[in-house]
Amino acid sequence: MIEHHIDIATDDGQMATFITYPESGGPFPVVLFLIDAPGKREELHDMARRISATGYYVVLSNLYYRDVRSFTVHREDPASTEQMFDLMSNLDNRLVAQDAAAMLAHADADAVADASRVGVTGYCMSGPFALWIAAEFPEVVKSAASIHGVRLAVDAEDSPHTRAAEMKGEILVM
């Protein structure tokens, strides 16, 4: 596996990102692997490696970069858990879609990535982000998964369900 730790430039700063893909072959379809609330950490890097081993270019970014360079919750520390909830509250679908645009632009510029075939996966906090991204980039997002996603259909202007008709790819909600 090829692995890189890079910063992707966004309008709001540098987004720390882990990218992994197979050593040979390609170009590989892209997977935007969105963090869950505890943050970008080695556990997620391992999951990204498993996905990339099956033939994908996986992009795992720290979505909390606007506030912290890196974050991993320490569940035994109440202050760390409180910080996690504060960081979560600073994200919304539109911000994460802007981040996804930067991730996709980076992948599109990389010859080993096929940014015309994109999958997005989100767990819990990032489940609605995955669906929003599917609606925001319907021509390239071929699949999106929201696993135990929260706030998928709520009485809010940015509820992902309001954009269901814009999603052209396969959608998995579980």
Spell out what each predicted region is:
Residues 1-174:
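N-terminal cap/leader regions of alpha/beta-hydrolase-fold enzymes
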